[in-house]
Curated annotation (Swiss-Prot):
Pfam families: Myelin_MBP (PF01669). The gene is MBP. The modification Deamidated glutamine is found at residues 237, 281. Keywords: Acetylation, Autoimmune encephalomyelitis, Cell membrane, Citrullination, Membrane, Methylation, Nucleus, Phosphoprotein. GO terms for molecular function: calmodulin binding; lipid binding; protease binding; structural constituent of myelin sheath. It is a peripheral membrane protein. InterPro entries: Myelin_BP. The modification Phosphothreonine is found at residues 151, 154, 169, 214, 229, 232. This is Myelin basic protein. The modification Symmetric dimethylarginine is found at residue 241. It is found in: Myelin membrane. The modification Phosphoserine is found at residues 96, 141, 146, 153, 174, 190, 210, 249, 295, 299. Residues 246-256 are annotated as: Induces experimental autoimmune encephalomyelitis (EAE) 2. MBP isoforms are found in both the central and the peripheral nervous system, whereas Golli-MBP isoforms are expressed in fetal thymus, spleen and spinal cord, as well as in cell lines derived from the immune system.
């Protein structure tokens, strides 16, 4: 126990001596920092920053390891002197050009960056006022009118969706006319059978969830639905019947080629009234049982 107590006292004495030496070293470091600040008054940007931050570790190393350099504080700062322009010219160029609160003597020939920006704004002030109006109307995310001038092209308009919006409306109008308006033309024009008025009334009275394609659905949805399915039948336009009929009558085309619209309309009606006809309408009833009630996934074209 006595040995342990003696060791503890020795450790305490060592700690006190170490703290005293550390205090002396810290005072020396402060003196070094003050001397470096006084010697680097001609360069205020580097003086305080390098004395505190950049060269702090190097001064600590020299103060602890080498006693000769700590005795002479000038030698301790000769390796990386903050006011020496020859040792670090890139930092002098970086800090002394547009440093706040400094009058620049190094780059008198070249104007500063802020002056260049101001001259550019003054030169383009007359033209950028009208462009700012255009840019605020057409491109609200754009900040400068000059950039709008540089990128004013059809691709730029297409990126922001102005030209294709008008073009796509024409395309979609034609698609909507093909899907919606022209669908009724062959039904009215072909008076081949007695199922004709019943079928048109049946189309109107159907609930929109019950068949695979709603009558008043968005033509954009039809357009993309028919593009995604690989076997869209474009010759159905030339055959003289609407796309809705070719959509619902594809299952019976190969089996009963001789029938006209009446047979297919009766198939269509019976398939929706509870799937009663099982003898010749088996394929259609199966298809509409599988996916006829979902207008997106139950398109018969996708199952062909």
């Amino acid at each position: 126990m006595g040995n342990h107590a003696g060791k503890r006292e020795l450790n305490a004495e060592k700690a006190s001596t170490n703290s005293e030496t550390n205090r002396g070293e810290s005072e020396k470091k402060r003196n070094l920092g003050e001397l470096s600040r006084t010697t680097s008054e001609d360069n205020e940007v580097f003086g305080e920053a390098d004395a505190n931050q950049n060269n702090g570790t190097s001064s600590q190393d020299t103060a602890v390891t080498d006693s000769k350099r700590t005795a002479d504080p000038k030698n301790a700062w000769q390796d990386a002197h903050p006011a020496d322009p020859g040792s670090r010219p890139h930092l002098i160029r970086l800090f002394s050009r547009d440093a706040p609160g400094r009058e620049d003597n190094t780059f008198k020939d070249r104007p500063s960056e802020s002056d260049e920006l101001q001259t550019i704004q003054e030169d383009s002030a007359a033209t950028s006022e009208s462009l700012d109006v255009m840019a605020s109307q057409k491109r609200p995310s754009q900040r400068h009118g000059s950039k709008y001038l540089a990128t004013a092209s059809t691709m730029d308009h297409a990126r922001h969706g102005f030209l294709p919006r008008h073009r796509d409306t024409g395309i979609l109008d034609s698609i909507g006319r093909f899907f919606g308006g022209d669908r009724g033309a062959p039904k009215r024009g072909s008076g081949k059978d007695s199922h004709h008025p019943a079928r048109t009334a049946h189309y109107g009275s159907l609930p929109q969830k019950s068949h695979g394609r709603t009558q008043d659905e968005n033509p954009v949805v039809h357009f993309f639905k028919n593009i995604v399915t690989p076997r869209t039948p474009p010759p159905s336009q030339g055959k003289g019947r609407g796309l809705s009929l070719s959509r619902f009558s594809w299952g019976a085309e190969g089996q009963r080629p001789g029938f006209g619209y009446g047979g297919r309309a009766s198939d269509y009606k019976s398939a929706h009234k509870g799937f009663k006809g099982v003898d010749a309408q088996g394929t259609l009833s199966k298809i509409f049982k599988l996916g006829g009630r979902d207008s997106r996934s139950g398109s018969p074209m996708a199952r062909r």
